[in-house]
């Protein structure tokens, strides 16, 4: 027994038997989601390092993202901007961590709108609403569309998008 009074002997020092224990952090099944259901992700601050790595990996070596002196003299926003595609990628990462682990099957389409600039040091989160769910012709999967709002620490909506995804159904 542990000091909290919880039985621990069953698994202490053992590797077998864990397959019967529920996995936490699993994604949602399409048939568990209802139109109108809302959720939000954890928040994440976008750093200078995030921008540098993203620009390097993607080849987006635009001076607006790489030259701080140019940004100071030419930018109308007065700070290092975050590429809109990086904002989107971070949002998808936040959603993957909280809603799609082992259940997401395919990303099919979306309409992405960048509404306001995001700059280094901004903290964003996704606020999502389920707007469509339906089964497909093949059993065990369905389509889910959400309307996602990307909100910064000032409660400003900086982007919106409405992905359509193929998602696993609850196992029978």
Regions found by a protein language model. Name each.
Residues 1-34, 114-172:
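HotDog/MaoC-like acyl-thioester-processing domains
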Residues 2-109, 170-172:
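Hot-dog-fold acyl-thioester-processing enzymes
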């Amino acid at each position: 027994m542990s000091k909290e009074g919880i039985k621990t002997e069953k698994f202490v020092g053992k590797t077998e038997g864990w397959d019967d224990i529920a996995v936490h952090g699993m994604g949602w099944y399409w048939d568990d989601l209802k139109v109108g259901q809302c959720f939000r992700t954890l928040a994440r601050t976008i750093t200078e390092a995030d921008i540098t790595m993203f620009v390097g990996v993607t080849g987006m070596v635009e001076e607006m993202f790489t030259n701080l002196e140019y940004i100071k003299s030419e930018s109308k926003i007065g700070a290092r901007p975050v590429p809109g595609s990086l904002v989107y990628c971070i949002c998808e990462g936040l959603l993957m961590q909280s809603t799609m682990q082992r259940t997401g099957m395919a990303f099919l389409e979306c309409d992405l709108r960048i509404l306001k600039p995001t700059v280094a040091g901004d903290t964003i989160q996704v606020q999502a609403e389920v707007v469509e769910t339906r089964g497909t012709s093949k059993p065990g999967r369905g389509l889910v569309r959400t309307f996602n709002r990307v909100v910064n620490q000032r409660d400003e909506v900086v982007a919106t998008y409405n992905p359509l995804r193929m998602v696993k159904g609850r196992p029978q």
